[in-house]
Amino acid sequence: MLSVRIPLAPITNPQQLQLSPLKGLSLVDKENTPPALSGARVLASKTARRIFQEPAEPKTKAAAPGVEDEPLLRENPRRFVIFPIEYHDIWQMYKKAEASFWTAEEVDLSKDIQHWESLKPEERYFISHVLAFFAASDGIVNENLVERFSQEVQITEARCFYGFQIAMENIHSEMYSLLIDTYIKDPKEREFLFNAIETMPCVEKKADWALRWIGDKEATYGERVVAFAAVEGIFFSGSFASIFWLKKRGLMPGLTFSNELISRDEGLHCDFACLMFKHLVHKPSEERVREIIINAVRVEQEFLTEALPVKLIGMNCTLMKQYIEFVADRLMLELGFSKVFRVENPFDFMENISLEGKTNFFEKRVGEYQRMGVMSSPTENSFTLDADF
């Protein structure tokens, strides 16, 4: 039976035109839109609103000096398609991140409660405050990735990595929030820890340091890459070491295992920042990089030796200061510059764990997790009948 097409009735009511889902739809400020086309942003967090003071009337800004000379930042009309791969080293970093995907549900916290209750009050105080810092800091890293880096960088391989990093930072933040939720039973104390950026001056100081870099309209991409390499490579290093110290004592297996997973991820994120820095044509001077790194070291040393001293869990504050300097030197080397502090690693238990640039977690496969087949070449998974036996 032939179908009969009924002609559309003419539109007599002008209001019917407003029913179209495309009416008034703007493609500005959507995913993969270059920053120059972005409209007014609705900022997700109070801290971001505090940093970003956008003008009431948007003004057309000229491209930042050097953007057209930077292959990473130059507008790329092929950014919507992944293949063919142009930056193979950046793509391999993305595949490493993809191979190491994990979720908070994989971490067993059942034994931690008994350990937590047996800890001294000062040890519980230290751990809870470190977790509060971690829970907030991953959100700040994501604020930077969403607001700045993902919009500025135009090469597809790096955008893939940043997208996956955002997902992993969300998992880290969920893991830390879950740890606080598991250990802290008092609702008021729990709320205090979840709002650490506003309730703890020591955490607020570190957060403000990072947030200032997100909101700095004058700083170059290269300077901000160094700053956030410092956030993930220096600001996290001392706290990671303090939790690994608990592992050395045989305490808190769930906390320490999640710390292994997260520190491995952050090591990779730090390595990626260094790789992006190496791809820049116009890099900040060594003097400027040293200034940023030294400033980050001072903030972290104050955090773990004065504001929240590691002596609360039995660690030596002087050695912790030295360890932070050691990590900073490794970061300077990975960025292609000379060491600043020239000190040895004072913590033997961190020898294979420190965020040293060339992450050795993939060789050691910490926690025995890596997605099967993700790092394999296509030919490795093919079936043949002519193999040698």
Swiss-Prot record:
Keywords: Cytoplasm, Deoxyribonucleotide synthesis, Iron, Metal-binding, Nucleus, Oxidoreductase, Phosphoprotein, Ubl conjugation. Binds 2 iron ions per subunit. The modification Phosphoserine is found at residue 20. It is found in: Cytoplasm; Nucleus. One of its GO terms (cellular component) is nucleus. Belongs to the ribonucleoside diphosphate reductase small chain family. PANTHER family: RIBONUCLEOSIDE-DIPHOSPHATE REDUCTASE SMALL CHAIN, RIBONUCLEOSIDE-DIPHOSPHATE REDUCTASE SUBUNIT M2. This is Ribonucleoside-diphosphate reductase subunit M2. It comes from Macaca fascicularis (Crab-eating macaque).
